[in-house]
Amino acid sequence: MFKTINKSITSILLLLISFYQKWFSPFFGPRCRFIPSCSSYGYEAITRHGPWKGGWLTLKRLSRCHPLTPCGCDPVPD
C-alpha cells in the first residue's frame, strides 16, 4: 500500500512540474540561477529519489534560488 501511495504522489508531483514547464515557464523566461533549472532539478530529484526525499531536495533547491546566492551547476545528488 505504501508503494502505491508513493507512486501516486510521484505521479502527481511530476504532472505538476510538467504542467509548470509547459504552460507557465515560457511566459516567465529563463530566471533560474542554476543548471539544470529548478523545475528540471525537481523532476529529476523526484524521479530518482521518490516523492519524499526528492521533494525535500527540490524545496532546498528552491530556497537557494535567489539573487543573493551564487549561480552555477547544481546537479541532483546520487
Swiss-Prot record:
Segment forming the signal sequence: none
Pfam family, one: YidD
Keywords, comma-separated and alphabetical: Cell inner membrane, Cell membrane, Membrane
InterPro entries: Membr_insert_effic_factor_YidD
Membrane topology per record: Peripheral membrane protein
Transmembrane segments: none
Keyword Cell membrane: yes
Subcellular location: Cell inner membrane
GO-annotated cellular components: plasma membrane
Biological role stated in the UniProt entry: Could be involved in insertion of integral membrane proteins into the membrane.
Family membership noted in the UniProt record: Belongs to the UPF0161 family.
Protein name as catalogued: Putative membrane protein insertion efficiency factor
Taxonomic lineage of the native organism: Bacteria, Bacillati, Cyanobacteriota, Cyanophyceae, Synechococcales
